[in-house]
Amino acid sequence: MVHDLLRDRADLEARWNPSAYMQFARLRQRPVVELLDNIELCCPERIYDLGCGTGIATELLARRWPLAELHGVDSSVEMLEEAARLPIKASWERANLRHWCAERPASLLFAAAVLHFLEDHGKLLPRLLGQLAPGGCLAAHMPNWRDASWYRLMLDALDSAGPGGASLGSPALRYRLHRRNVLSLDNYYRLLAPLTAELDIWETEYLQVVDGNDPIFDWIKVSALRPVLGELDEEARRRFLDRYLELLHRHYPRELDGRTLFPFRRVFIVASLGR
């Protein structure tokens, strides 16, 4: 029954779904708070929340710096419509971050759980630093999920759930999913240290405790799984979900209290320019 319901909703879930994304709002807010706690700006004039989504981070930015000129940027109309309902003073812009440029130099570029979707960080991050005002700061956190069990299981299902153990989806899709966008911490240091006056890089692993029949799937279907659900046809999607849910249940069993443990690692970067 659960599998059938998930299949029926797959086309919807392949798009950004604000209500589904907000299902774990408290857990998604934790790394935002951790990142904010490590930003030492006093009175930033202009803040851009890149990949603002439903405005989880934007609202916290507005509370921290109520006098700042605040801009939320996202590629999803649905997410921006949800964010625009927040009781905060902010402007909202639809844009693809691959090509986005700030209209005016930023005091703070805040990127919560978005840069890992973009490739070639060796060019991306220097380009973002170039849009900061003197003394400005680029602050980002990114899920470091490439080696996570649930991600490897997703790749396994995609590579072997077809008829006779064949792969599913196009070679281009499998290439994108196998590619690593997030760099190692030392490589971020080597990239950013020559370009910044102050640099702080760290990684945190959260032991997330989640509820529900398929909580791991519920978490990733609105983010990492979107390219898969969006590309596979109905039959391929059925095969993939059958296999993937089986693997998830096996590797993430429920605890005695009925909840599921979901370890999740994130990389944090706070890079500041000199004045």
From Swiss-Prot:
Name of a matching Pfam family: Methyltransf_25
Transmembrane segments: none
Enzyme class of the recorded protein, top EC level: transferase
Domain of life: Bacteria
SUPFAM superfamilies cross-referenced by the UniProt entry: S-adenosyl-L-methionine-dependent methyltransferases
Matches recorded under InterPro entries: Methyltransf_25 (IPR041698), SAM-dependent_MTases_sf (IPR029063), Trans-aconitate_MeTrfase (IPR023506), Trans_acon_MeTrfase_C (IPR023149)
Compartments it resides in: Cytoplasm
Gene Ontology biological process terms in this record: methylation
Keyword annotations of the record: Cytoplasm, Methyltransferase, S-adenosyl-L-methionine, Transferase
Catalytic activity annotation: trans-aconitate + S-adenosyl-L-methionine = (E)-3-(methoxycarbonyl)pent-2-enedioate + S-adenosyl-L-homocysteine
Chief place where the protein resides: cytoplasm
Molecular function GO terms recorded: trans-aconitate 2-methyltransferase activity
Record keyword Methyltransferase present: yes
Cellular component aspect of the GO annotation: cytoplasm
Keyword Protease: no
The protein's Enzyme Commission number: 2.1.1.144
Protein task: Catalyzes the S-adenosylmethionine monomethyl esterification of trans-aconitate.
Family statement drawn from the similarity comment of this UniProt entry: Belongs to the methyltransferase superfamily. Tam family.
Name this protein carries in UniProt: Trans-aconitate 2-methyltransferase
